[in-house]
Amino acid sequence: METGQKILVAIDDSENAIRAVEHVAKFFTPSNKITLFSVLQDTVTMFNMNHPELTPYFMAQQTYFGELEEKQKSIVEEAQKKAKKILLDAGFKEENITLKSQHKQKGIARDIIEAASGYNIIVMGRRGLSGIQEFLLGSVSDKVLHSAKDISVLIVN
C-alpha cells in the first residue's frame, strides 16, 4: 500500500473489528496515519427512554441506563486500547495513531462516513449477523460500503 495515507478504522468491541485492525497492521505500512474510530450508542435513544408512555418505575430506572452507557464507553475504550497495541506491535508509531469516539448522531454508518471526510480509506470488519437479521436490519458495513462516496472502503471478513 502507498505510504502516508489517512486510514479510518471503524471499530467496536467485536472480533470482526479486531480482525480489521490486524489486517491494517499486516498489509498497511507503519507510515500511514491511523484513526481508530468508534460510534457510541446513546442509551436513552437505544432504549426509547424519551417515550411519553414510560411507566414511573421505568423512568426511575434511568440511572441504571446511564450506568450502561458508562459501561459501553469503557468497553469501547478497552477495544481501542487493544487495537492500538496491535498497531504499535506491528511497528506503527504512537503519533500516527489517533483514538476517536463520538455518540451516535445520524446513524452509525452515516457517522462513520462523515468522520471519514479527508481520509483515503475506511477499513472495518464485517458484522456477523445471520442472513435474516442482515436482510431485516442491514449491516453497518453494508451501509457504509454502499453509501460512501469518493472514498475506498475495505471490509475485512
What are the residue ranges of the model-derived segments?
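Small/aliphatic-rich secondary-structure junction motif
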Residues: 2-66
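General small-molecule cofactor/ligand-binding pocket signal
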Residues: 35-37, 98-102, 154
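Gly/Ser-rich helix-loop-strand patches that form or flank binding pockets
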Residues: 114-157
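Active-site phosphate/pyrophosphate- and oxyanion-stabilizing loops and adjacent acidic/basic residues
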Residues: 22, 110, 142-143
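Structural beta-alpha unit
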Residues: 81, 85-121
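Amphipathic coiled-coil/heptad-repeat helices and related helical stalk/stem segments
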Residues: 17-20, 108-109, 137
